[in-house]
Amino acid sequence: MEAWESSQPLLRCEIPCPLPGTDRDGSVSLPGEAASCDLDTLEPEHGNRRVSGNPISVCWAYKVTKVKCWSVRERGGRHIGGPRSTLKHPAHHGMGKNLATSLPTAASLGLGKGQLLVSIRFMDTTKKRGQSETFNIC
């Protein structure tokens, strides 16, 4: 799992590097009283450097096609928002600036700390097959 810091010092993002056809979980941490998680901070250009000695993530070759939010308090992870953002022209090698979408925090939805999930669907650019990744906003 690779991690990098965003342009906002309060936000630290960790993204898994999935193999095609596999699903893994990652997390987006929102410490303190952060109001939203701007997905633009997950873009490689915002943190194109090594963090804790780890090499740059290879999963940036994936395209992001949509973002959804769930409440994990509901059984089965009931979907609470619909796609927050859908790229019309997804960028290769990362998520692209078009996905600068602010997501509500768990607190703003009355869910409490660690109660909001963000699911980002990656598109495998080599096999043209989509897969989903889930990020837990703590």
UniProtKB/Swiss-Prot annotation:
Q: Which branch of life, at top level? A: Eukaryota
Protein name (Swiss-Prot/TrEMBL) = Uncharacterized protein KIAA0087
What organism does the UniProt record list as the source?
Homo sapiens
Gene this chain is encoded by:
KIAA0087
